[in-house]
Amino acid sequence: MMKGGMAGLMKQAQLMQEKMQKLQEEIANAEVTGQSGAGLVSVVMTGRHDVRRVTLDDSLMQEDKEVLEDLIAAAVNDAVRKIEQNNQEKMAGMTAGMGLPPGFKMPF
């Protein structure tokens, strides 16, 4: 391989790494809202899966503990699914043209 070709590949790899770091930061800082019970419970979660806020409708205070626990769990699960979908969509744009098989998960 020519010297210039190798330098070009190295530069391209460095640019890709910088874009990937920026994308990872963007994904980590993104917030999604998961909901359950037709919006009676909502959970705001970051791309790092940190729960920022849990909101319960006042009407739920009359429900028994198990119903409330189930609704909170469902809202958290909804938020996690949304984060994973968001991550896949963002990574798909980044990895398009790399020739990776569909559904391939990057190790980060």
Swiss-Prot record:
GO terms for cellular component: bacterial nucleoid; cytosol. Coiled coil: none annotated. Gene3D superfamilies: Nucleoid-associated protein YbaB-like domain. It comes from the Bacteria. It is found in: Cytoplasm, Nucleoid. GO terms for molecular function: DNA binding. Keywords: Cytoplasm, DNA-binding. Belongs to the YbaB/EbfC family. Binds to DNA and alters its conformation. May be involved in regulation of gene expression, nucleoid organization and DNA protection. PANTHER family: NUCLEOID-ASSOCIATED PROTEIN YBAB. This is Nucleoid-associated protein Avin_19840. It comes from Azotobacter vinelandii (strain DJ / ATCC BAA-1303).
